[in-house]
Design a protein with these regions (language model features):
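Helix-to-loop junctions at the C-terminal end of transmembrane segments
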Residues: 78-91, 191, 196-197
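Hydrophobic/small/kink-forming positions within alpha-helical transmembrane segments
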Residues: 74-78, 182-190
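Central cavity-lining transmembrane alpha-helices of secondary-active solute carriers
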Residues: 67-82
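Cytoplasmic-side transmembrane-helix entry/capping segments in multi-pass membrane proteins
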Residues: 92-101, 121-124, 145-149
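Symmetry-related core transmembrane helices of the 12-TM Major Facilitator Superfamily/SLC fold
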Residues: 98-105, 202-219
Length: 238
């Protein structure tokens, strides 16, 4: 038996983890837009545009409707990076898993909020989305975003163009990764719209379930490596 160790990437960057993160990201965005007052949880460019429109119309109450989620999104990025810097040497849990646990907790609480609390609900969902986009920035070594599509679309088309010009199989594979993530995001949004019809405010809990799967998947690499080390130790004795 060959005991040579193979180099493995982080499970937090594996496509299967990104798959559930992207499904969750699409669901979060449709949840706040359709159920929480036409606010985007992830697409802050859209929120800035709508905020500017209402500001120039003198509708200051509506400005606040978009400004608060924007501010909480910024705070979410700050919080995720702070956790990265302070908790990156943890042994039992990866710091990214702690971020996912924080996301799950916040989104679970949002499921109890009535629509009169939409401002706070949107703030918490935006905070959670920002933590996710700051924490999970690569899939199989490629830069990506699990909560928005414009960067993925640009990178996907860039890689596709590279393949058309050079017939480089790696470029085509890279393009497939990006378009796969975009399709999963769209699928999450579509499924989210269906769960809203069935569950209302509690539809966000389906996002919690998807994040929980991602959390569990991040244990997988550690388990595999421990098994490999045990096998190698056994071979050494013989």
């Amino acid at each position: 038996m060959n005991s040579k160790k193979k180099r493995r990437g982080q499970m937090s960057e594996a496509f299967c983890t990104a798959m559930f993160l992207s499904l969750s990201g699409g669901l979060q965005d449709v949840y706040t837009y359709l159920f929480r007052g036409k606010v985007f949880a992830n697409a802050q460019t859209g929120n800035i545009v709508l905020m500017a429109v209402h500001a120039f119309a003198g509708e200051w109450g509506r400005v606040l409707h978009y400004l608060v989620p924007l501010c909480f999104f910024a705070l979410g990025v700050f919080a995720a990076e702070l956790m990265h810097q302070k908790l990156q040497n943890l042994q039992r849990l990866h710091w990214r898993q702690l971020v996912v646990l924080c996301e799950i907790a916040m989104l679970f609480v949002v499921g109890f909020f009535p629509q009169e609390w939409n401002l706070m609900a949107n703030a918490l969902v935006s905070f959670a989305c920002a933590m996710q986009v700051q924490t999970f920035r690569k899939v199989n070594g490629y830069a990506f975003a699990s909560t928005m599509c414009i960067g993925n679309m640009r990178s996907g088309m860039d890689s596709l163009c590279s393949w058309v010009l050079n017939r480089n199989p790696a470029a085509l594979k890279k393009s497939f990764y990006y378009w796969g993530i975009i399709l999963l995001f769209a699928l999450g949004a579509g499924l989210g719209s269906l769960t809203l019809d069935l569950c209302g405010a509690k539809a966000i809990w389906f996002s919690c379930l998807l994040l929980a799967v991602s959390f569990c998947l991040m244990f997988l690499k550690e388990d595999v490596e421990e098994i490999k080390e045990d096998l190698e130790a056994l071979e050494a004795k013989h």
